[in-house]
């Protein structure tokens, strides 16, 4: 490739889908979707959000991805998510896995640091939650199917602005 071809390509490059993907960005409300589904990725997202929005309440709705990953990293997930002001945990997205007895989102919930507002919700109730609440900065985290709700979440929140 020539330098000019690269320049032209960069002009039209829109970034990676679902990596810190802003859907709404106003003074009153920020909504973004992030594919982060590993504690290190969540840590980086939480760190960036905390730096960008120092004086704003940051809420994450997180859907853990895989029972084995949740079992192996629940403390790390809790540590990374504890950088945020509020964490709303959905049920684990199983993908290709069968449930593992005793492995649920509650493992993460129980290990969130004191001071973090926390709750658990079924994915099917997320839209009702978004309708009933006001948010400052809201990030939808995970690699599961919670992302399917993002267009409707965006629509609901835009009607509130």
Name each model feature, range by range:
Residues 1-86:
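Nucleotide phosphate-binding/pyrophosphate-handling subdomain across enzymes
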Residues 5, 70-71, 98-99, 149-152:
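Short glycine-/acidic-enriched loop or helix-start segments at secondary-structure transitions
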Residues 37, 64-66, 93-95, 143-146:
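Short glycine-rich anion-binding loops that position phosphate/pyrophosphate groups of nucleotides
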Residues 61, 90, 140-141:
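Short hydrophobic segments within beta-strands
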Residues 78-136:
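C-terminal helical cap/extension that packs against the catalytic core
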Residues 104-112, 152-161:
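A short, gly/pro- and small-residue-rich
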């Amino acid at each position: 490739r020539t330098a000019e071809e690269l320049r032209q390509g960069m002009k039209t490059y829109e970034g990676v889908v679902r990596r810190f993907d802003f859907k709404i960005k106003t003074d009153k409300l920020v909504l973004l979707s992030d594919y982060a589904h590993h504690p290190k990725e969540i840590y980086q997202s939480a760190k960036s959000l905390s730096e960008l929005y120092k004086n704003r309440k940051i809420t994450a709705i997180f859907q853990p991805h895989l029972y084995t990953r949740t079992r192996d990293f629940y403390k790390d997930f809790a540590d990374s998510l504890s950088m945020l002001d509020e964490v709303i945990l959905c049920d684990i997205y199983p993908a290709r896995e069968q449930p593992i007895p005793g492995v649920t989102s509650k493992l993460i919930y129980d290990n969130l640091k004191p001071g973090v507002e926390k709750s658990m919700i079924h994915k099917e109730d997320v839209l009702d939650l978004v309708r009933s609440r006001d948010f400052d900065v809201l990030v939808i985290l995970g690699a599961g199917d919670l992302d399917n709700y993002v267009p409707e979440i965006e629509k609901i929140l835009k009607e509130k602005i």
